[in-house]
Design a protein with these regions (language model features):
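Absolute protein N-terminus
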Residues: 1-2, 109
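N-terminal first-folded block
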Residues: 3-43
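Feature captures the catalytic cores and cofactor-binding loops of soluble hydro-lyases/lyases
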Residues: 23, 32-44, 48-109
């Protein structure tokens, strides 16, 4: 599914990155080591972490996009690194549980 479709259907805020990127999986976690060990490539990652290390983790794993929940803001350095590495950054005012359920309903597993 195109990330742009997910943005439209869930009313997410687009921060940076190519909305035409395709994702196949969803993954919700705030522990970076867990994401490194368990997330799959071509994933949309749902989290409350906003620091620059999330971009490094996403790049290593092959995660295509990140949804930051609970109305949190990305750090400037995170946005800059995401642009450099082609990672899509999105935001939601909803909590991770609600966003995860909606992403699941769209068919990402």
């Amino acid at each position: 599914m195109r990330i742009g479709e997910i943005v439209e259907k869930l009313g997410l805020e687009h921060v940076c990155g190519d909305l035409n990127v395709e994702v196949e999986h969803g993954f919700t976690c705030d522990l970076l080591s867990e994401v490194l060990g368990k997330a799959q490539p071509s994933t949309l990652w749902i989290t409350v972490q906003s620091h620059v290390n999330i971009v490094a983790v996403a790049t290593v794993v092959g995660i295509k996009g990140i949804i930051l929940c609970n109305g949190h803001e990305y750090e400037r350095e995170t946005i800059d690194k995401a642009r450099e590495n082609g990672i899509v950054l999105l935001k939601s005012s909803e909590n991770s549980f609600m966003v995860s359920g909606k992403v699941y309903e769209l068919g990402l597993r």
